Design a protein with these regions (language model features):
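Walker A/P-loop phosphate-binding motif and the immediately C-terminal alpha-helix
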Residues: 1-22, 139, 184-185
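Residue-level preference for the first positions of well-ordered beta-strands
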Residues: 7, 44-46, 147-149
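Short internal beta-strands
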Residues: 9, 99-103, 178-180
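TRAFAC-class small GTPase G-domain
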Residues: 11-28, 33, 43, 79
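A short acidic, often aromatic-flanked loop/helix-cap motif at beta-alpha or helix-coil junctions
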Residues: 14-18, 108, 130-138
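Conserved catalytic-core segment of NTP-binding enzymes
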Residues: 31-35, 40-41, 45-131
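Extreme N-terminal, non-catalytic leader segments
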Residues: 122-147
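Patatin-like phospholipase
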Residues: 149-151, 156-214
Length: 214
Protein backbone atom coordinates (compact mmCIF):
# COMPACT_ATOMS: atom_id res chain seq x y z
CA UNK A 1 0.00 0.00 0.00
CA UNK A 2 1.12 3.54 -0.71
CA UNK A 3 0.37 4.87 2.78
CA UNK A 4 -1.53 3.92 5.96
CA UNK A 5 -4.47 5.98 4.67
CA UNK A 6 -4.69 4.16 1.33
CA UNK A 7 -4.95 0.62 0.04
CA UNK A 8 -4.31 -1.17 -3.24
CA UNK A 9 -7.00 -3.66 -4.25
CA UNK A 10 -6.10 -6.34 -6.79
CA UNK A 11 -7.90 -9.29 -8.32
CA UNK A 12 -5.38 -11.64 -6.72
CA UNK A 13 -6.08 -10.09 -3.34
CA UNK A 14 -9.79 -10.80 -3.76
CA UNK A 15 -9.08 -14.38 -4.86
CA UNK A 16 -6.86 -14.93 -1.84
CA UNK A 17 -9.47 -13.50 0.51
CA UNK A 18 -12.21 -15.79 -0.77
CA UNK A 19 -9.88 -18.73 -1.50
CA UNK A 20 -11.21 -18.77 -5.07
CA UNK A 21 -9.61 -19.73 -8.38
CA UNK A 22 -11.60 -17.31 -10.52
CA UNK A 23 -13.21 -14.00 -9.66
CA UNK A 24 -16.43 -15.01 -11.42
CA UNK A 25 -16.84 -17.74 -8.79
CA UNK A 26 -17.20 -15.11 -6.06
CA UNK A 27 -20.76 -14.08 -5.33
CA UNK A 28 -21.21 -10.42 -6.30
CA UNK A 29 -22.83 -9.58 -2.96
CA UNK A 30 -19.86 -10.95 -1.00
CA UNK A 31 -17.35 -9.19 -3.24
CA UNK A 32 -19.21 -5.89 -2.93
CA UNK A 33 -19.31 -6.31 0.85
CA UNK A 34 -15.53 -6.73 0.90
CA UNK A 35 -14.92 -3.75 -1.37
CA UNK A 36 -17.35 -1.59 0.60
CA UNK A 37 -15.53 -2.41 3.82
CA UNK A 38 -12.13 -1.61 2.34
CA UNK A 39 -13.39 1.71 1.01
CA UNK A 40 -14.83 2.58 4.41
CA UNK A 41 -11.58 1.72 6.20
CA UNK A 42 -9.30 3.76 3.93
CA UNK A 43 -9.34 7.31 2.62
CA UNK A 44 -8.09 6.25 -0.82
CA UNK A 45 -8.58 2.93 -2.63
CA UNK A 46 -6.67 2.03 -5.78
CA UNK A 47 -8.33 -0.75 -7.77
CA UNK A 48 -5.67 -2.27 -10.02
CA UNK A 49 -6.95 -3.70 -13.32
CA UNK A 50 -5.56 -4.82 -16.64
CA UNK A 51 -7.05 -5.22 -20.08
CA UNK A 52 -6.31 -8.95 -19.92
CA UNK A 53 -8.60 -9.42 -16.90
CA UNK A 54 -11.95 -8.23 -18.23
CA UNK A 55 -14.15 -9.77 -15.53
CA UNK A 56 -12.33 -8.04 -12.69
CA UNK A 57 -12.23 -4.71 -14.50
CA UNK A 58 -15.97 -4.80 -15.15
CA UNK A 59 -16.62 -5.53 -11.47
CA UNK A 60 -14.62 -2.62 -10.05
CA UNK A 61 -14.92 -0.01 -12.81
CA UNK A 62 -18.37 1.22 -11.68
CA UNK A 63 -16.78 2.12 -8.33
CA UNK A 64 -14.15 4.37 -9.86
CA UNK A 65 -14.06 8.11 -9.20
CA UNK A 66 -11.11 8.37 -11.57
CA UNK A 67 -9.55 6.15 -14.23
CA UNK A 68 -5.75 6.15 -14.29
CA UNK A 69 -4.20 4.66 -17.43
CA UNK A 70 -0.53 3.66 -17.33
CA UNK A 71 0.60 3.39 -20.95
CA UNK A 72 3.86 2.56 -22.73
CA UNK A 73 5.23 5.56 -24.63
CA UNK A 74 6.89 3.29 -27.21
CA UNK A 75 3.47 2.25 -28.51
CA UNK A 76 1.35 4.16 -30.99
CA UNK A 77 -1.58 5.93 -29.26
CA UNK A 78 -4.09 4.57 -31.80
CA UNK A 79 -2.81 1.04 -31.24
CA UNK A 80 -3.11 1.40 -27.48
CA UNK A 81 -6.64 2.77 -27.69
CA UNK A 82 -7.65 -0.13 -29.92
CA UNK A 83 -6.33 -2.57 -27.31
CA UNK A 84 -8.57 -1.14 -24.57
CA UNK A 85 -11.81 -1.06 -26.53
CA UNK A 86 -13.87 -2.50 -23.67
CA UNK A 87 -12.71 0.31 -21.38
CA UNK A 88 -13.33 3.00 -24.00
CA UNK A 89 -16.82 1.63 -24.61
CA UNK A 90 -17.73 1.57 -20.92
CA UNK A 91 -20.03 4.14 -19.36
CA UNK A 92 -17.29 5.14 -16.92
CA UNK A 93 -15.15 6.31 -19.82
CA UNK A 94 -17.62 9.10 -20.55
CA UNK A 95 -18.53 10.02 -16.99
CA UNK A 96 -15.36 9.62 -14.91
CA UNK A 97 -12.25 11.80 -14.78
CA UNK A 98 -9.44 10.23 -16.81
CA UNK A 99 -5.74 10.60 -15.99
CA UNK A 100 -3.05 9.52 -18.44
CA UNK A 101 0.36 8.34 -17.19
CA UNK A 102 2.78 7.90 -20.10
CA UNK A 103 5.71 5.67 -19.14
CA UNK A 104 9.15 6.24 -20.68
CA UNK A 105 12.01 3.77 -20.44
CA UNK A 106 14.72 6.30 -21.26
CA UNK A 107 15.41 9.81 -20.00
CA UNK A 108 15.61 11.60 -23.35
CA UNK A 109 13.48 14.45 -24.65
CA UNK A 110 9.75 13.74 -24.49
CA UNK A 111 7.90 14.04 -27.80
CA UNK A 112 4.52 13.11 -29.23
CA UNK A 113 2.41 14.31 -26.30
CA UNK A 114 -0.22 15.87 -28.57
CA UNK A 115 -1.03 12.49 -30.13
CA UNK A 116 -1.74 10.95 -26.73
CA UNK A 117 -3.91 13.85 -25.63
CA UNK A 118 -5.88 13.85 -28.86
CA UNK A 119 -6.46 10.10 -28.72
CA UNK A 120 -7.50 9.85 -25.05
CA UNK A 121 -8.59 13.40 -24.13
CA UNK A 122 -7.60 13.02 -20.46
CA UNK A 123 -8.36 15.54 -17.75
CA UNK A 124 -4.72 15.37 -16.64
CA UNK A 125 -1.56 13.70 -17.89
CA UNK A 126 1.91 12.87 -16.61
CA UNK A 127 5.16 11.75 -18.22
CA UNK A 128 7.09 9.32 -16.01
CA UNK A 129 10.63 8.08 -16.57
CA UNK A 130 10.33 4.66 -14.94
CA UNK A 131 14.02 4.59 -14.00
CA UNK A 132 13.78 7.93 -12.21
CA UNK A 133 13.07 7.67 -8.50
CA UNK A 134 12.08 11.34 -8.36
CA UNK A 135 9.41 10.81 -11.01
CA UNK A 136 7.95 7.84 -9.15
CA UNK A 137 7.98 9.71 -5.86
CA UNK A 138 6.24 12.68 -7.47
CA UNK A 139 3.52 10.43 -8.89
CA UNK A 140 3.04 8.76 -5.52
CA UNK A 141 2.52 12.14 -3.84
CA UNK A 142 -0.07 13.05 -6.44
CA UNK A 143 -1.91 9.74 -6.00
CA UNK A 144 -2.09 10.41 -2.27
CA UNK A 145 -3.16 14.04 -2.63
CA UNK A 146 0.14 15.26 -1.16
CA UNK A 147 1.54 17.20 -4.12
CA UNK A 148 3.34 20.44 -3.34
CA UNK A 149 3.40 23.38 -5.73
CA UNK A 150 5.54 26.51 -5.95
CA UNK A 151 4.61 29.78 -7.72
CA UNK A 152 7.35 32.37 -8.23
CA UNK A 153 6.77 36.10 -8.49
CA UNK A 154 8.19 38.62 -10.95
CA UNK A 155 10.36 41.65 -10.39
CA UNK A 156 13.01 41.73 -13.08
CA UNK A 157 16.54 41.11 -11.82
CA UNK A 158 15.20 40.71 -8.29
CA UNK A 159 13.72 37.44 -9.49
CA UNK A 160 17.19 35.93 -9.45
CA UNK A 161 16.79 35.79 -5.67
CA UNK A 162 14.64 32.73 -6.32
CA UNK A 163 17.89 30.79 -6.77
CA UNK A 164 18.87 31.34 -3.15
CA UNK A 165 15.40 30.38 -2.05
CA UNK A 166 15.60 27.11 -3.99
CA UNK A 167 18.97 26.34 -2.40
CA UNK A 168 17.32 26.77 0.99
CA UNK A 169 14.42 24.52 -0.01
CA UNK A 170 16.88 21.88 -1.23
CA UNK A 171 18.78 22.04 2.05
CA UNK A 172 15.50 21.58 3.92
CA UNK A 173 14.65 18.52 1.83
CA UNK A 174 11.56 20.06 0.21
CA UNK A 175 10.55 18.66 -3.17
CA UNK A 176 8.05 20.42 -5.43
CA UNK A 177 5.75 18.77 -7.95
CA UNK A 178 4.28 21.80 -9.70
CA UNK A 179 5.86 25.07 -10.76
CA UNK A 180 4.29 28.31 -11.88
CA UNK A 181 5.28 31.93 -12.06
CA UNK A 182 4.88 35.35 -13.60
CA UNK A 183 7.42 37.40 -15.58
CA UNK A 184 10.96 36.39 -14.52
CA UNK A 185 9.36 34.00 -12.05
CA UNK A 186 7.86 32.09 -14.98
CA UNK A 187 11.32 31.74 -16.55
CA UNK A 188 12.77 30.44 -13.29
CA UNK A 189 9.82 28.10 -12.80
CA UNK A 190 10.30 26.67 -16.30
CA UNK A 191 13.93 25.86 -15.55
CA UNK A 192 13.00 24.26 -12.25
CA UNK A 193 10.27 22.27 -13.98
CA UNK A 194 12.89 20.94 -16.39
CA UNK A 195 14.83 19.61 -13.42
CA UNK A 196 17.70 22.10 -13.45
CA UNK A 197 19.61 22.44 -10.20
CA UNK A 198 20.30 25.94 -8.78
CA UNK A 199 23.89 25.87 -10.11
CA UNK A 200 22.63 24.99 -13.59
CA UNK A 201 20.13 27.84 -13.44
CA UNK A 202 22.96 30.26 -12.63
CA UNK A 203 24.74 29.07 -15.80
CA UNK A 204 21.54 29.51 -17.82
CA UNK A 205 21.02 33.01 -16.43
CA UNK A 206 24.54 34.03 -17.40
CA UNK A 207 24.05 32.66 -20.91
CA UNK A 208 20.65 34.24 -21.62
CA UNK A 209 20.71 37.42 -19.52
CA UNK A 210 24.39 38.40 -19.34
CA UNK A 211 26.35 36.98 -22.28
CA UNK A 212 23.59 37.60 -24.83
CA UNK A 213 22.49 40.84 -23.09
CA UNK A 214 18.87 40.87 -24.37
Amino acid sequence: DLSPESTVITEQGALNHFVAQDVTAIKPARLNELLDRLEQDKDICHHVCSQERQDWMEMVLPRADEIWMFLDSSKEPAQVRQSITSLVDSRAWETVKKVLVILHQGTGTITGTAKWLEMFKPHQHFHIHVSEGNDRARLKRYLLGQSLGLVLGGGGARGFAHIGMMKAFDAAGLRFDWFGGTSIGAVMAAWLGQGLAPAEIVTAIRKFFVDSNP
